[in-house]
Amino acid sequence: MFYVFLANGFEECEALAPVDILRRADIAVKTVGVGGKTIIGSHGISVNCDTDNLNLTTDGLEGIILPGGMPGTLNLEKDSTVQKFIDYSACNNLLICAICAAPSILGHKNLLNGKTATCFPGFEKELLGATLSPDPVVRDGNIITAYGAGAAFDFGFEILSAVKGKDFSDNLRKQMKYK
């Protein structure tokens, strides 16, 4: 199971492209509203989340996904439940996936020390201890980062590759007619 944490001001495609890809692959994914079930994205799109952040469990958790966007990233970072699940995922070597501005949250928690990572331009200084990459998506151990909305599908396919393997991910890519 993956939790995709959504806070008001999140970048819609960065959250929903990975959800779509993982669900097509029959991977359990729950969208989690930070502060309620209905969350408004940075472009005014309202999303009714599967659950809120009050009744979550770590049972069966495979990883977490943190979309970027502003002020969504700031809202994620200040939420204690999001922080708890980042810590749990890090301690248990689960996948921690962050895109756009959201890798800054991982940098602030010193989770990128000695890792290679990418982010939206302008947030590089927040990736404390990381070796910066210009690549759209970077996977280093249990951490997957991506640089923005234009990489949302590649981000989703990289998460899928980490869970079910590259061949499985490539086959779904072909089925979806994605490069």
Task: For the regions a language model picked out, list residue spans one by one.
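Long, charge-patterned amphipathic alpha-helical coiled-coil/hairpin "stalk" segments used as oligomerization
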Residues: 121-123
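Conserved hydrolase catalytic core segment
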Residues: 111-113
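Extended, subdomain-level signal for the structured scaffold at the beginning of enzyme domains
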Residues: 1-92, 104-109, 126-134, 145-179
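Beta-strand-turn-beta hairpins that frame and shape the catalytic cleft
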Residues: 138-143
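Short, thiol/selenol-centered motifs that function as redox-active sites or metal-ligating centers
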Residues: 99-100
